Amino acid sequence: MSASIYLVKGREKSLLRRHPWIFSKGIERVQGNPIDGDTVEIYTQDGKWLARGAWSGSSQIRARVWTFDKEETVDLDFFIRRLKYAQESRDGLIKRQGLTGYRLCAAESDGLPGLTIDRYADFLVCQILSAGAEFQRDLITQALRTLYPECSIYERSDVAVRKKEGLKERTGVIYGETPTEPVVIEENGGVKILVDIRNGHKTGFYLDQRDNRQAAAKYTEGKRVLNCFCYTGGFGVYALKGGAKEVVNVDLSQNALDIARQNAELNGLDTSNTQFVRHDVFKLLREYREKGDKFDVIVLDPPKFAESKAQLLGACRGYKDINMLAFQLLAPGGVLLTYSCSGLMEQSLFQKIVADAALDAGRDAQILELLSQASDHPIGTAYPEGFYLKGLVVRAR
């Protein structure tokens, strides 16, 4: 018999709105002795059934909802149904954009809490981030093998958030082949990208920026472009395809820069007007400022500055500093494409930070576009935490 949890009176409101998390302070009592990952029944204080979820005794998020349907059991068929629906909901996008790399499963936003799956050609790369997904790892693997018999499955659960769930980090082959070399994917009608599945950031690449890379290209014709935190050069490739006269790609990782060069060459682009600079972005921007260098287009796509609420204030200072430096380097009429991937950073706050940065740089500016994550990274209407990537296209006078 499965364990049951009963909520503090009033704490059922978020579940009635179909939010998938139950925090430790929202639980009045537990009936039974669930182990981490166990499926538990969730009730109101007075015994009304609400949902069925996964228990995590180590996390502040004490349970994550698998289903709000009392008749739905969490078994192999459950995972096949959820993954099949996730795939079908993306099929139109895949066809329109010619994708061989896409996010197959966006965790809570696809009804599978703690499970992220990206597809790169014939490799499925999984991040298992919750006790519930960890507990169901074998069933998830079986479901993927049923739906994608042609694919190898590789795990990249080397993420610090697992510690909050009482889990150790883990990587390696779950099924099939090891991706010994970078895998080539295509996006946006034929743009080729090399993805280092084993050693790259996240699961290997930033699929969420796909639409924003394409959007950037329309600003680069005949322009001098500075691509900061370039990783493997995605924005740089699109800048060159858009007709940039010069592109400077900057990153701290030499391995990422090497792949960035390969990505440009893979797309048949002339790299004679392209630099691949290994440098700290903050320091380099200050050096450019001291030299009086100017750029027509600057891309700021930094790593996550805030992993927790305690880090948010420091993150705000970091975002303001780097955006101010960028405004100081923009030529008159220049365009800044700036992003935050910190889920804790609300859109309105990010917009205020960028506005304050322009003010401190002494520049009048206009927001031309508000940008977000690609649509294979959906945002559940009951799960606003799924909205994490914010972007602005800003023109400085």
From Swiss-Prot:
Its main location: cytoplasm. Transmembrane segments: none annotated. The keyword Transferase applies. Its EC number is 2.1.1.191. One of its GO terms (cellular component) is cytoplasm. This is Ribosomal RNA large subunit methyltransferase I. Coiled coil: none annotated. Pfam families: Methyltrans_SAM, PUA_3. Gene3D superfamilies: PUA domain, RNA methyltransferase domain (HRMD) like, Vaccinia Virus protein VP39. It comes from the Bacteria. Keywords: Cytoplasm, Methyltransferase, RNA-binding, rRNA processing, S-adenosyl-L-methionine, Transferase. Specifically methylates the cytosine at position 1962 (m5C1962) of 23S rRNA. SUPFAM superfamilies: PUA domain-like, S-adenosyl-L-methionine-dependent methyltransferases. The keyword NADP does not apply. The lineage of its organism: Bacteria, Pseudomonadati, Pseudomonadota, Gammaproteobacteria, Aeromonadales. It comes from Aeromonas hydrophila subsp. hydrophila (strain ATCC 7966 / DSM 30187 / BCRC 13018 / CCUG 14551 / JCM 1027 / KCTC 2358 / NCIMB 9240 / NCTC 8049).
